[in-house]
Each structure stands twice: as C-alpha cells, then as structure tokens.
C-alpha cells in the first residue's frame, strides 16, 4: 500500500512476474501517474515431458490428507496459470502424488482427488478443460526414501505431497 506520492521525490519501481523479464525503473514522483512501463515476456523453451514446476522453480504442495489447493499454493498456481495463458497451445498433464503414510488404495484415491482439484482450479481460473489431463499416482513415485516404515520428518513427507504439470503438447 502506498502513501501519497510526492512529485519532488525519486522512486524505484520493480516489475516482476514469472512469465516476464524483471524490469526496474527510477522515476520522479510527478512522472508516475501518466508514465507507461513496459515489460517483455520471457521466452520459455519447453518440450513434451518438461515439468512446469521445475521450469518455473516453484512448488505445489498439499497438506496431509487434504486435496484442496492450499492458500500458500495459490501464489504458485498463479504462475502456472500465467504461463498457460501466455502459451495458449500448451497442454499439460497434472500428476498428483501423496506421501506413504496411509494404505496404497487410500493414497491412490487421495491423489486422484488432488489431481482433479488442481485441474478444477485451473479451469476456474480460465484455462480450457481440453488443455488439461490429470491423474493421481498415490505413493508410487516418491521423491525421497520416505517409504512405509521409514522414519521421516514432516518436511520430508511434505515433499511427496505434490502436483506436477507435465507438458504433453
């Protein structure tokens, strides 16, 4: 939130977004109101099989036994949405996962709920349904050794409760 902009002062403005090149400006307060600031889109090189999570250096995690998009993840989801809007021909496969702390059947069901919830969130935010496929993988693709019976921290388990956005076209 800004207070009054003083015309005699110099201000520093930084425009930053995952889909655009960061741009910085120095302007006098009196010039801000009618000044146009332009930022250029990033050119992201993608190919089928790439994961938007890795390309954007973000994380989409879920709470234990939950499938809704957590408030913290909404910021990261906005970055995925921005890329999908910039590249309207991009199609992705949403792959959702769980940790290993329940039965395999339970985790497979939960991961399918996560995948569907993630897809529905994207659709609700303007991404066409025909650009999205989704599937839950349960605990079958853990990122670490936190398998059944292995003692792990909450943080280690958290790494496995995730969604990936794999480019398919």
Task: Enumerate the language-model features and the residues they cover.
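Periplasmic peptidoglycan-binding/tethering modules of Gram-negative envelope proteins
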Residues: 2-91, 154, 169
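Periplasmic OmpA-like peptidoglycan-binding domain that tethers envelope proteins to the cell wall
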Residues: 95-169
